[in-house]
Each structure stands twice: as C-alpha cells, then as structure tokens.
C-alpha cells in the first residue's frame, strides 16, 4: 500500500484554495490505477456545503477540503476542514488505500484545522461538523 504519490496539482490547487481563497472546496480521488492522488473537482466560492456533500460519490472513497465559515459568541470564524470519505459501499481495498495514504495528503495540505472521517451522509450533518470543529478549535 505504500508508495502512493500525490500529483503536483494537489498542492498547487490546495495553495490556491488556502492562500487565494479561490475555491469553496476541493475533492481528491485516486487515479485509475490507484497509484496517485489527483484533484477531481474544485468548486467556486459560491458553492455550498450541501454541494460538497452531493459531490461525494456513494460507492467510492474521496478526500476533501472545505472552507467552513461559522459563527461563535466571539464572532465569525473560518476553518479549513479535511474530510476522509470512505462510504460503506466502497471496496475494502479502496478504504485501506485511502486510510493508509491519509497521513501523506494531510502532511502536504498545510493549515488544516480539523479532520472528519465519514462513512455515510448522516455523519456529514453540517451542525454536527460545526459542533465538532468548535470543540477542537478552542
């Protein structure tokens, strides 16, 4: 399982996302021969969290980063959230590859505030995500 590489576009597109606020979210996948993580989709700043969830496939694993904006008693907050999406319908080998490569991609994506691992849409409830981020970010 070792040896999965990150396509150069992964860090380039992520840096545009983080530094230039060019996108609302990015979804990453493995290439066809499962040897490299590649950018699958970037979403315009007008995209919503619902769009992000809808772009995650039902039977294939993905990584994602989402620019989360939310309110606290202290005011508005913005955090970059990393998602590991391994739905119940995806193959065991794919789940293992994505889990094994998670540390590699997280290391390349500097500035992540929180990590969410989900296997079904119920685990992607926005209110629950915000609550988790608030507890992590104190």
Describe every region a protein language model picked out.
Residues 1-138:
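Long, low-complexity regulatory segments enriched in Ser/Thr/Pro/Gly and acidic residues
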């Amino acid at each position: 399982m070792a040896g999965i590489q990150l396509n150069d576009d992964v860090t380039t597109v992520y840096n545009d996302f983080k530094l230039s606020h060019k996108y609302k979210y990015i979804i990453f996948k493995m290439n066809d021969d499962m040897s490299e993580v590649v950018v699958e989709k970037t979403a315009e700043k007008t995209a919503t969290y619902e769009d992000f969830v809808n772009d995650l496939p039902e039977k294939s694993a993905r990584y994602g980063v989402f620019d989360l904006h939310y309110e606290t008693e202290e005011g508005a907050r913005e955090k970059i959230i990393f998602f590991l999406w391994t739905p119940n319908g995806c193959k065991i080998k794919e789940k293992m590859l994505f889990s094994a490569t998670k540390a590699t991609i997280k290391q390349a994506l500097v500035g992540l505030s929180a990590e969410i691992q989900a296997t079904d849409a119920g685990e992607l409830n926005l209110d629950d995500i915000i609550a988790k981020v608030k507890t992590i970010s104190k």
